[in-house]
Amino acid sequence: MKRSLEQIARLVSGRVVGDAAKKVSGAAPFEQAGPEEITLAGSAGFLKRIDQTGAGALVVPTDFTDSRRNLVAVENPAAAFARIRQMFDTGCRQPVGIDPRAVIGGGFACGEDVSIGPGVVIGDHVTLGDRVLLYPGVFLGNHVRIGNDGIIHANTSILRECVLGNRVIIHAGSVIGSDGFGFAPDGEMYVKIPHSGMVQIDDDVEIGAGNAIDRATFGRTWIRQGVKTDNLVHIAHNVTVGENTIIVAQVGIAGSTTVGRHVILAGQAGISGHLDIGDNAVVGPQAGIVKSIKPGETVSGTPGMPHKLWLRAQSIVAGLPGMRKKIAELEKRLAVLEKG
């Protein structure tokens, strides 16, 4: 479906420079865009080469004034272009309706325009909102609730009593609501601790492929609004992750830790249990965090330390062999002096 630049500008709160009635049918990369496509020229490097793209229109910063081309000027070109791409991206959506090869339990309720693919298994008393999309092989346990516009990709399991908000996306192979890793020592044995809580995932959360988010021992494991996780992330029982936090691949968060808002946890970081990670904190890649982090602090290394201190420590590492040799020589000279 074609859209006019005027329609696009309204979508992204932008301003049209040029022909507002110009219609485009999609979005494309700068070098490949054609006359019926819109592209992104959000940085100085692309703006200098604006005559080299065949695009019918460009998304640009508000301070760009070249009027030779059709432009949509916005405050944040990258975010605006992402929204434009969402508008044109229909994906490979399966047809609306319930595939006859799906298995659905009693007390099922759903909204309008739901799509349930082959091999989906739905337990008892499950509720789906409008336009929910369940790809093949999805499993929903008893009493699961999913809000409007949810997309659950293939072979994902959402276990009993878990609750998902609106516009939640969960990628293939993730498990939501598995038992937490909880065992009580009893001599040489371990007694399993029942996990009777649930997982709550709020609006506009996107969970990567192969994630495992454990249900709470009591209460809830809580993934709050706008959180984005990369692939292969583990979030343990009773963890709370604050709004709009980013969790990169292979991060592990141990039980009962609270992660604040707008936090960045870089790849392969490990967070110990029962900690508080403050709002706007940044944890570097492969960091091992064993104590709480203050709001706004940037921490790196294992054990985690302030990032600047970690950089200083790392700068010393390469010189340690030479320092060891010098110390050995000094020890020999000192021994000679002591024998005097």
From Swiss-Prot:
Pathway: Bacterial outer membrane biogenesis; LPS lipid A biosynthesis. It catalyses: a UDP-3-O-[(3R)-3-hydroxyacyl]-alpha-D-glucosamine + a (3R)-hydroxyacyl-[ACP] = a UDP-2-N,3-O-bis[(3R)-3-hydroxyacyl]-alpha-D-glucosamine + holo-[ACP] + H(+). It comes from the Bacteria. PROSITE patterns: HEXAPEP_TRANSFERASES. One of its GO terms (cellular component) is membrane. One of its GO terms (molecular function) is N-acyltransferase activity. Its EC number is 2.3.1.191. It is an enzyme of class 2 (transferase). InterPro entries: Hexapep, Hexapep_transf_CS, LpxD, Trimer_LpxA-like_sf, UDP_GlcNAc_AcTrfase_non-rep. The keyword Lipid biosynthesis applies. This is UDP-3-O-acylglucosamine N-acyltransferase.
